[in-house]
Design a protein with these regions (language model features):
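Short strand-edge motifs at loop-to-beta-strand transitions and within beta-strands
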Residues: 109-111
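Aromatic- and carboxylate-lined catalytic core of secreted/periplasmic carbohydrate-active enzymes
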Residues: 1-102, 120-140
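Short beta-strand edge segments in extracellular beta-sheet folds
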Residues: 105-107
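Residue-level detector of conserved, well-ordered beta-strand and adjacent loop positions
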Residues: 114
Length: 140
């Protein structure tokens, strides 16, 4: 469900692909891939749909999707990570923007959070949609 379509069809063109790759790039720009150490899958689950995450000493990042409906009102739980304070950043995959950044605390190796259902920006309400990406960055 990420915006990038992994299938080729006559409806796929440069305008669609370039826009979608740009959205993904805005997310990955925040992850220092070349500096990550001790990279491993993180345990992550959600009430409905699917979730996947990676952890390292520097950052935890993941993706949550519900292709049957949406991720609004979803509860995401990430486990097997280090205790402490983190900056949680929730990313809108279709618009290519971070919707929310807030400080959270990991206790007993676990953090749970929910995506915003609607985000009001100026005079517009932005629906979260069928998927989201997230980053948990340790606060030092």
């Amino acid at each position: 469900m990420t915006p990038f379509w992994w299938a080729h069809s006559r409806f796929l063109n440069d305008n669609i692909v370039n826009s979608q790759i740009t959205s993904i790039r805005r997310f990955t720009d925040r992850i220092p891939f070349s500096k990550l150490t001790d990279i491993a899958p993180a345990q992550v689950k959600c009430l409905r749909g699917d979730a996947y995450a990676m952890k390292s000493n520097e950052v935890v990042f993941g993706w949550v999707v519900n292709s049957d409906s949406d991720v609004a009102g979803e509860k995401v739980t990430v486990s097997s990570i280090k205790n402490g304070k983190y900056k949680l950043m929730i990313f809108h995959t279709w618009r290519g923007v971070f919707l929310e950044e807030k400080e959270v605390t990991v206790t007993n190796g676990t953090i749970s959070f929910g995506p915003p259902y609607m985000r009001i920006t100026g005079s517009q309400a932005n629906y979260i949609g069928q998927d989201l990406a997230f980053i948990l960055e340790p606060m030092i």
